[in-house]
């Protein structure tokens, strides 16, 4: 690889999860592409080849906000904003659109942590 691509790779390795998410959104906007479409295709291939083993090998999960207590709406909104890095308006729209996927394609540990954080403040979450 060239020195320039090596430098970019090292910079990417140092990004936090939130920064990486923001970078993906900026790349999608700048180049008119969608990371979600290609991830869905990649996930479909192992399931088709593996047959019954697909459920055991699942490594990416979607965290879905199913509902929330009306009294806890602000706390749920704050938890969603913290987890996604969205602005207030976008996070509010996401929470009010429940049931809605909050995060997609995350590891099991991250999904469980997010579920716990949102349920602690009054949201009902499922992991798919």
UniProtKB/Swiss-Prot annotation:
Claim: Manganese is one of the keywords in the record: no
Keyword Ribosomal protein: yes
Record-level GO cellular component terms: cytosolic large ribosomal subunit
GO MF assignments: mRNA binding; structural constituent of ribosome
One GO BP: translation
Protein purpose: Forms part of the ribosomal stalk which helps the ribosome interact with GTP-bound translation factors. Is thus essential for accurate translation.
Subunit structure: Homodimer. Part of the ribosomal stalk of the 50S ribosomal subunit. Forms a multimeric L10(L12)X complex, where L10 forms an elongated spine to which 2 to 4 L12 dimers bind in a sequential fashion. Binds GTP-bound translation factors.
Name of the protein in its database record: Large ribosomal subunit protein bL12
Organism: Synechococcus sp. (strain CC9311)
Phylogenetic classification of the source organism: Bacteria, Bacillati, Cyanobacteriota, Cyanophyceae, Synechococcales
């Amino acid at each position: 690889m060239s020195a320039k691509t090596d430098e970019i790779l090292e910079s990417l390795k140092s990004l936090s999860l939130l920064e990486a998410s923001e970078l993906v959104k900026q790349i999608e906007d700048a180049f008119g592409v969608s990371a979600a479409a290609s991830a869905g295709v990649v996930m479909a291939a192992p399931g088709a080849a593996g047959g019954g083993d697909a459920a055991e090998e699942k490594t990416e999960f979607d965290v879905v906000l199913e509902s929330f207590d009306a009294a806890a709406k602000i706390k749920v909104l704050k938890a969603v904003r913290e987890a996604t890095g969205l602005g207030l308006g976008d996070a509010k729209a996401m929470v009010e659109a429940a049931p809605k996927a909050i995060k997609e394609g995350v590891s099991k540990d991250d999904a469980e942590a997010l579920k716990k954080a949102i349920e602690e403040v009054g949201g009902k979450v499922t992991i798919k």
